[in-house]
Amino acid sequence: MLKYILTITLTFGMLTTGAKAEDKPELVIYTYDSFASEWGPGPQIKAEFEKTCNCVVTFVGLDSSVGVLGRIQLEGGSSKADIALGLDTSLTSIAAKTDLFLPHNLETRGKLALPDDVGFWDDPYFVPFDWGYFAFNYDKNRLANAPSSFDELLADNDLKIVIQDPRTATPGLGLMLWVNAVYGEQAPEIWAKLAPKLVTVTKGWWDAYSMFLEGEADMVLSYSTSPAYHLIAEEKDHYAAAGFAEGHYMQVEVAGVLKSSKKPALARLFLQKLMEKEMQSILPTTNWMYPAAASGDVPEGFGDLINPAKSHLFSPEVVAQNRDQWVKDWVEGLSQ
């Protein structure tokens, strides 16, 4: 009889616990796979928000930021996502024109710590959460004399490089913008000069970076902050980013609330918390980027990273106007 009572009690307890969990609203966030991964910021961000939101956060990891935007466009107004996280300023104008995003209605004035080159942040749909520079990374044990400019990189016929596709990966898109910012109308010639040095062009960042780590390339397109991971997490100081005399292209990552969300107030609360100290301080040692808000802390290892004297950043509108032609130039240049 006691066994029977215990069984009924435990079963009822499990059912009520499950019911309570189901009663909590679910906040669905589309992002890129490394953000949502167990070693990315996703799990810590989820735990931090769930402390106070009385909700369940679900990250849906897609192959890239470009993939996030593509998924949202495909699903349209029927998307299950409440938030898109991980787009950057090369995609925000295109994203805004889909008419799938709500204004964030958050005050960012005085709360951000973005470089001066970004200017005053007045985007009504997207709030920044981190930023960094694109750079070619190398292993000092394998490459003693890394190029210090695009011109030196292009002149070295022995270099083996791996990059990403701008149509599918944000770093690849960043390189395309970087080259156009530096060389303008000469960009097609630069792609033709770069082509013989390429081991391959990958779909995503990790595909390229893992090839580099396995010794299949001398340099990989990544971020100026990537060496911080090796230094802080692995205690390895032989990975570095090459500082280029022409300057580096900047990336600012953002998040926005979708019109399809049935929980816009909760989604906006998440964006607000994303700019506060607790979440901002998670990002440098999980997403390996600089925090976008003034409240974020940067660990000691970041002081050893390159600090470009010059940076480049097109407005979202310029990217939207020229992206298709620049992609065409990229394809044709690498095909020569």
Model-found features: residue ranges?
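A ligand-binding cleft/hinge motif common to bilobed small-molecule-binding domains
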Residues: 90-94, 213, 217-238, 287
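Mature extracytoplasmic/periplasmic domains
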Residues: 258-314
